Every structure is written in C-alpha cells, then in structure tokens.
Amino acid sequence: MSKPLPRKLFVTTALPYANGAFHVGHIMEYIQADIWVRFQRMQGNEVHFVGADDAHGAPIMIAAEKAGLTPQQFVANIAAGRKQYLDGFHIEFDNWSSTDSPENHELSREIYRRLRDDAKLITTKSVEQFYDPVKEMFLPDRYIKGECPKCGTKDQYGDSCENCSAVYAPTDLKHPYSTLTGATPVRKSSDHFFFRLSDPKCVAFLREWALDGQRLQSEVANKAKEWLEGEGGLGDWDISRDAPYFGIEIPDAPGKYFYVWLDAPVGYLATLKNYFDKTGRDFDAFMADPSTEQYHFIGKDITYFHTLFWPAMLKFADMKVPNNVFVHGFITVSGEKMSKSRGTGISPLRYLEIGMNPEWLRYYIAAKLSSKVEDIDFTSDDFIARVNSDLIGKYINIASRAAGFITKKFDGRVATDWATSDDAFLSRLRNVASEIQALYDQREYGKALRAIMEQADAINAYVDANKPWELAKDPAKEAALQEVCSRLLEAFRILTIYLKPVLPALAKQVEAQLNIAPLEWHHIITPLPHGHQINPYVHLMTRVEPKMLDALFDMPALVDATVGVPTSPSNKDGDTNGNGHAIESIAPEIKIDDFAKIDLRIAKIVNCEHVEGSDKLLRLTLDVGEGRMRNVFSGIKSAYKPEDLIGKLTVMVANLAPRKMKFGISEGMVLAASAADEKANPGIYILNPWPGAEPGMRVG
C-alpha cells in the first residue's frame, strides 16, 4: 500500500456568530470537519484547518451596548470562551481569528474594489428600508420579523425564511414588526450598494460551477438549480448597511458598511492569511497555486450564501473559487429541534462539566453522519447502546482480552513470527483499508464505522474461537497463547488506525499502551515487530451510564424544561430585586399575538410521585378540566415533596406539544420561578393561584 501523492487542502467550517457560546450544532459541524481533516493528514496530505468568529453586525453592536462594552470588547469576551469547547472535544483548528481582524478589513475592501472597478458588478440603488420610530434607527434584517412572502410562514426574519429558504428584502415581509420594540416599522429611503448577481456572466458561471454534477451534493445542486431557474431568476444582492453599524466601512462611501454576509465568508481567507503571516507562509502564493483545494463545511441553513454569492464574489474578484461546499443537516434530540425552553438542547459545556467522555459524542455523531444533507437525531437510549456496544463491547474488549496475558506471561513482548497459514485473519482486516479510506474521504462516516465494526465483530469471533483464557490454563500451550494474543493486539492496532480520525485521544492512549509512534494510515501494513514490548495494560474507556444522560438533560438552568425558570443564570445588566438579588434581564418585547399563542390553564395536582432513576424529576398527574388526566414531568424534586403537592392548584402550559422523555410522555409544562443567581437563592417556586380558581380556567 503506497502513500498517495500529497494534496494541499484549505478547510473551514462556518463562522459562528460572536454573540454567544457554542451550541451542539456548532460542535457537530466542527467534529465532522475535524474528522475529515485528521483523516487527510493521516494520508500525508498538507491541510490548513482554520476558523474565526463572525464578529460584525447590528446584533453584536446592540448586545455590546446593552452590556456596557465596545463591540470589540464584547467579541473578545465571547472569543475567550471558545477554547474550552474546542479543546474539550479534541477539535484542532490551526488558527482561530475574527472577521474584525486587519486581514479581513483589507481583503474585504480589496474584493469589493475588484468587483466594483474590474468586474463592474457593483451598482447603487435607492432602497426603502424599515426604520424603527421608537429606537430611531434603520432596522437590520434580523431585527425585523413578519410573514414570509413566499410560503407564508409567520415570524420569519427580514432576510431569509427558515422554512422554505427563500431570500428576500425586509420590505417584502408581510405584517412586519420590530423585534427591538414591537413597533410597526416605517419606510425610509437610503442609497445602497448591490452586487449584481443577476448579471448574465454571474448566472452563466454559477450554472457551470453549481450544476456540473461533479461538485455539490445532489440535494444542494437541485436547490441551486431551483434558485437559478426559478421565477425571476437571481436577484441582485444588497451588500451595504447604514450607520450606526459595527462592521467594515465601504471604500469611498462614508457612513456605509458592508453587510455582514459580505465580509463573513471573506473571513475564511483572512484567518488563513493571519495564520500564514504568523508562520511565515506566503498566502498569495498558496491561494494562487492551482493544486490548492478549498473546502467549506456548512449547515443547510446558509446554503444560498455559500453556493451563489460566495463563489460568484470570488470568481469575479479574480480569486480562487471553492472546490466544494459540504452541507450537513441539523441535530435533533429525540426527534425534536433543539430548544432551551423545551429542554431539548444538549449543552456541550454541560456535557464536559459532568465528566462525559468527549469521544463518546465524537463517535456517536460520526456514526450518524453521511454525505447527504440529512438531520441526525440524538436519543439517550441509542447513545448509550451504540457507545457501549461498539466502543466498549467490540473495540476496547479486544485489547482488554489480550494485553493482560502478554504482560503477565510474556514480559509484555509480542510474537509475530507467525505461520503463513494463518495470515488470512489479518489480511482480511487489512484488505478493507481502501474501502474505509474511500468512505472517510467521501464523508460517509456512518458507513465507515459500520465497516470497521464488522471487522471488530470478526476479531471478537476469533477471540471466542481461540479462547485465550483457556489456553492460559495449560502451560503446554503458552506459545499458542502468545501467538493468539499477539494477533489480537495487531488487529487492535489496525482498528485503532481506522478509528483514529474519530477517536484521536483514545488513539494516543493506545499508542502509549502499545509503545509505538503516532499511527499513520500507511502503518496498516507494517505489523508490530517480533519481540516488541508493550506497556502494562491500563483501562482505556469506561461505559456510558444512564445517570450521566439524566444529568446531561436535567440541567439546573432548565429544570428539565417542564418548569418555566430562567435559561441563563447570567445578569449582564446588573439589575436587582427588592432583596438585592440579581434578576435575569427582561426578554425582548413580544406582540400580544405572540402571547396569545400560549394557552395557560389552572391545573389541579391529582397525584404526584417520585420518578425512579431521576434526581430532579417529579411525575405529576394533572386535571385541567378537560375530562382526562395529564401526565407531566417537572424538575422540582429538590424543592417539593410529592405529598405536599397533591390536591394543590397550579398553572400549566396546556397547548405545548407532548414531549417524549426517557421516563414517559410529558403533556405540558408546569410553571415555576427561580432566581437568576442560584447561589443567592437556590429555591424553585411553583405557581399557585388564589382561592376560587378552578381546573380548566384560562390564565391571561
């Protein structure tokens, strides 16, 4: 097996917006890209894997103002928290920068000048914008909501629809409102700069680039074709925003700034340039090299920007266009979209803080991923079963059944001068290398791991057939015992090579255990030498326990989502109540129509009992006056005894969709209060109406 010719790869993930911590969707994407990068490096390829914070835009400007910080300080505070997530999940970017970097200012302006002066693709138009008469500012797209003009979905942002992926002008929204004040915005005119995406040369290029059948995933190419050939074709792209705005000022246009979606993807190039400048590499030469390959891993919600605007910008700025854009779906939890308020989210930081092995999640996500644009679903039972069965029961089990005998009986030395008649066992394992290699390269991680686990099954069958524990009982069979266990360790070594892109930390432990240098792909054909001495066996990985998943979802700040307590303990405004305790900041205003969607009802607690296996939940049987009882799980066990609640009245959200939990179906949400500062006041206070209220009465 010869090493392939090295490739030169430039790889990015979508830039996270610098207004909050990473969520599990970010981590999923970073794991997907990190696996691919690690695999490519194991092939001997040159890979530059870079990321950055998306730092510009009105949301950050407004959030910084509210926090009493400059936008730069606000972004720096967010960036300071990134490392614990990336290190925690073994995600290794070569560089992490910001779109507010000098490199991004320079490159964004240069690309704009080329589009304006050379390609003649920048034009100016007078635009009617929404203006908030209360806030006295033009409203950014994300601070306007309304009904999608294409599909009619309500509460969509002012630039694109999350339901149908349509892109439109904010003024196209039906029934718009300001998310800052709730006011109905008024229209005002302003001169804006546009990138002429509708120009025939842009359209011709995008047809070739997006629809050639050699690049984009079929689902993505079909969507691009729909956009290119839809009624009206491609529209020109508004790339400017009016002051006040935190961003990059447009050359020769005082008071005008690049829309964040222009400079954000340029951040891919800027963070690579920043990295090359720090390491003494020539950025311009690297990007001009025709052998350089450029790849972007992104979520399906930003496909339009990355498959139309971005490649067209680069093409007509005379810069390298992406070789491909790899689009993935979302991650759901038990079939539901992630939501803090419903308790269906997974906190990556919580996962790490409670001591869960990050490589469990890396493996589980990889096992679910394919090259298709499909959502992946996380369920606790499947997570436990897959990790314990595959990693512990199949993979780790091989080493645990062989290494101990080698250490105890043979001074840790393996015997590899085997009879050629038995070579088929390891040959079969090595012969799947090219198949697994191709699957990794195609991002078919789920298929790759299934193929690897099939080999693990065959190895465990070899264990059962040769029974080393029986051989160890007979002194006359020591040579056979050493050979069997040595073969098993060699098989384990090869499996570790196959799994190393997914499980880098575990692979490092195995390398130390086997007393070998870091494993590369080409080491598959090079066995441990005869007489090689391994180190004493130490336990490599523990099993997942159900109580860990309970702890993951029974987050104190969420109280299992059946209690309406704050989802953030922070108080950035420093407000206090009459007792001097910090209170959570008031949420943005909503319209009365939004509140009217929530059906709050008086409920009688007919029965209440502990939930076996949960430290936080109580099971409530509620009468809401509808002729049947409801089952609701509530995370209030720390505050109430079941017998103290039976017969009491409370308030519940009656029209919340039933949620499937580990312990059963929860048919609503009981309301309760808790302090933002749990140390000052750790209590949970269930709502209890005054005498006279009856089950079924509506609260409003």
Curated annotation (Swiss-Prot):
Co-factor note (free text): Binds 1 zinc ion per subunit.
Reaction catalysis annotation: tRNA(Met) + L-methionine + ATP = L-methionyl-tRNA(Met) + AMP + diphosphate
Cofactor(s) in the UniProt record: Zn(2+)
Stored Gene3D superfamilies: HUPs, Isoleucyl-tRNA Synthetase, Domain 1, Methionyl-tRNA synthetase, Zn-domain, Nucleic acid-binding proteins
GO molecular function (one): methionine-tRNA ligase activity
Residues annotated as binding ATP: K340
GO terms, biological process: methionyl-tRNA aminoacylation
Compartments (UniProt record): Cytoplasm
Residues annotated for Zn(2+) binding in this entry: C148, C151, C161, C164
The protein's Enzyme Commission number: 6.1.1.10
Motif ('KMSKS' region): 337-341
Entry-linked PROSITE patterns: AA_TRNA_LIGASE_I, TRBD
Keywords from the UniProt entry: Aminoacyl-tRNA synthetase, ATP-binding, Cytoplasm, Ligase, Metal-binding, Nucleotide-binding, Protein biosynthesis, RNA-binding, tRNA-binding, Zinc
Motif 'HIGH' region per UniProt: ranges: 16-26
A Pfam family that the UniProt record links to this protein: tRNA-synt_1g
Gene Ontology CC entries for this record: cytosol
Subunit structure: Homodimer.
PANTHER family, per the entry: METHIONINE--TRNA LIGASE, METHIONINE--TRNA LIGASE, CYTOPLASMIC
Role, per record: Is required not only for elongation of protein synthesis but also for the initiation of all mRNA translation through initiator tRNA(fMet) aminoacylation.
Family: Belongs to the class-I aminoacyl-tRNA synthetase family. MetG type 1 subfamily.
HAMAP family: Met_tRNA_synth_type1
Protein name: Methionine--tRNA ligase
Originating species: Janthinobacterium sp. (strain Marseille) (Minibacterium massiliensis)
